[in-house]
């Protein structure tokens, strides 16, 4: 089968840095034990399992503050998605050692929020309800940051915003087209709003790659965890912008061969938190796949994964 390897794809620098920090923590005998990650270090179940194999456990809950209460001692790693000041403060109260793996792009958004709120602004934040990145961003100034995900949320914003200085900003991993559309709706309601688009460069170029390269494919396969917002947005971009059907899979085991019926060329991309070896297995399988040759339909030889985490230096 013809396979188009959509590029760029896969790991971004924030994800790589977060995983390296977590590995270095696991290998550092000077850090207090046990070591926990507060939420998934990046949104990929394979990565979570690999850290569990190294003795680093992931704890999760309805929100980060509640999840933190399950950690009694030792070291806590904060994930790439960022964390609220309340969680930092509670970790200090519990006398936990902290390793902060927050992506620098997320930190920049937090710094922006702090700066404008100090100057008496209200912040409208475009993001996904229930995702840890908006949770952390809203937590920077909960009384002044207003999370919106759809047009209806704009209509429900507090009336007093009309008389306030306002900025609109966003979660770094959203669809850039969705963010632009919502920001336009915000601008219509609040013509005086200041726009600060914080889509990270890695998200933007991966979405643009799908928009530009998927059009001549019959199907696009996005390799990424179901909890990975940026992976889900890549599938959405294929549908909405390139007009090419797309399926997101966590790994090769989730590939339904019936999707390949009548497909001549398939495009493959992957989310920013998807380990490269997992995507490579999908590409390798598809490249040898022949609908007419049943011997090429067996996924088993392509399922073995060895090292999936980036190499690190021991500190």
Curated annotation (Swiss-Prot):
Binding locations of (2E)-4-hydroxy-3-methylbut-2-enyl diphosphate: 43, 81, 131, 172, 228, 230, 273
Cofactor(s) required, per the database record: [4Fe-4S] cluster
Keywords (A to Z) from UniProt: 4Fe-4S, Iron, Iron-sulfur, Isoprene biosynthesis, Metal-binding, Oxidoreductase
Biological pathway: Isoprenoid biosynthesis; dimethylallyl diphosphate biosynthesis; dimethylallyl diphosphate from (2E)-4-hydroxy-3-methylbutenyl diphosphate: step 1/1; Isoprenoid biosynthesis; isopentenyl diphosphate biosynthesis via DXP pathway; isopentenyl diphosphate from 1-deoxy-D-xylulose 5-phosphate: step 6/6
InterPro entries referenced in this protein's UniProt entry, alphabetically: LytB/IspH
Catalytic activity field: isopentenyl diphosphate + 2 oxidized [2Fe-2S]-[ferredoxin] + H2O = (2E)-4-hydroxy-3-methylbut-2-enyl diphosphate + 2 reduced [2Fe-2S]-[ferredoxin] + 2 H(+); dimethylallyl diphosphate + 2 oxidized [2Fe-2S]-[ferredoxin] + H2O = (2E)-4-hydroxy-3-methylbut-2-enyl diphosphate + 2 reduced [2Fe-2S]-[ferredoxin] + 2 H(+)
Catalytic machinery residues: 133 (proton donor)
UniProt xrefs under HAMAP family: IspH
One term of GO molecular function: 4 iron, 4 sulfur cluster binding
Coiled coil region boundaries: none
GO biological process: dimethylallyl diphosphate biosynthetic process; isopentenyl diphosphate biosynthetic process, methylerythritol 4-phosphate pathway; terpenoid biosynthetic process
Residues where dimethylallyl diphosphate binds: 43, 81, 131, 228, 230, 273
Family note: Belongs to the IspH family.
EC number(s) recorded for this UniProt protein: 1.17.7.4
Organism listed in the record: Exiguobacterium sibiricum (strain DSM 17290 / CCUG 55495 / CIP 109462 / JCM 13490 / 255-15)
Top-level division of the source organism's lineage: Bacteria
Textual note on the cofactor: Binds 1 [4Fe-4S] cluster per subunit.
Signal peptide coordinates: none
Function as written in the Swiss-Prot or TrEMBL entry: Catalyzes the conversion of 1-hydroxy-2-methyl-2-(E)-butenyl 4-diphosphate (HMBPP) into a mixture of isopentenyl diphosphate (IPP) and dimethylallyl diphosphate (DMAPP). Acts in the terminal step of the DOXP/MEP pathway for isoprenoid precursor biosynthesis.
Protein name, entry field: 4-hydroxy-3-methylbut-2-enyl diphosphate reductase
Binding residues for [4Fe-4S] cluster: 12, 103, 200
Residues that coordinate or bind isopentenyl diphosphate: 43, 81, 131, 228, 230, 273
């Amino acid at each position: 089968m013809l396979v188009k390897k959509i590029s760029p794809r896969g790991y971004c620098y924030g994800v790589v840095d977060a995983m390296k920090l977590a590995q270095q923590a696991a290998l550092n005998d000077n850090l207090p034990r046990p070591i926990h990650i507060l939420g998934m270090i990046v949104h990929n179940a394979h990565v979570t399992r690999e850290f569990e194999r190294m003795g680093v456990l992931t704890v999760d809950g309805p929100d980060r503050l509640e999840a933190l209460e399950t950690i009694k001692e030792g070291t806590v790693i904060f994930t790439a998605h960022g964390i609220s000041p309340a969680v930092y403060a509670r970790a200090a109260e519990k006398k936990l050692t902290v390793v902060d793996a927050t992506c620098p792009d997320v930190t920049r958004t937090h710094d922006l929020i702090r700066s404008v709120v100090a100057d008496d602004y209200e912040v409208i934040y475009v993001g996904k309800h229930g995702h840890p990145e908006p949770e952390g961003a809203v937590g920077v100034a909960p009384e002044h940051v207003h999370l919106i995900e759809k047009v209806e949320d704009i209509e429900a914003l507090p009336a007093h915003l009309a008389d306030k200085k306002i900025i609109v900003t966003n979660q770094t991993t959203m669809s850039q087209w969705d963010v632009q559309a919502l920001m336009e709706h915000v601008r219509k309601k609040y013509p005086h709003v200041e726009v600060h688009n914080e889509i990270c460069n890695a998200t933007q170029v991966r979405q643009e790659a799908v928009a530009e390269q998927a059009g001549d494919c019959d199907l696009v396969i996005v390799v990424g965890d179901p909890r990975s917002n940026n992976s889900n947005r890549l599938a959405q971009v294929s549908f909405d912008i390139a007009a090419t059907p797309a399926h997101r899979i966590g790994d090769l085991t989730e590939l339904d061969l019936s999707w390949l019926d009548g497909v001549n060329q398939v495009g493959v991309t992957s989310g920013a938190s998807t380990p490269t070896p997992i995507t490579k297995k999908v590409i390798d399988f598809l490249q040898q796949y022949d609908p007419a040759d049943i011997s090429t339909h067996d996924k088993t030889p392509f399922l073995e994964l060895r090292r999936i985490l980036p190499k690190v230096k021991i500190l």
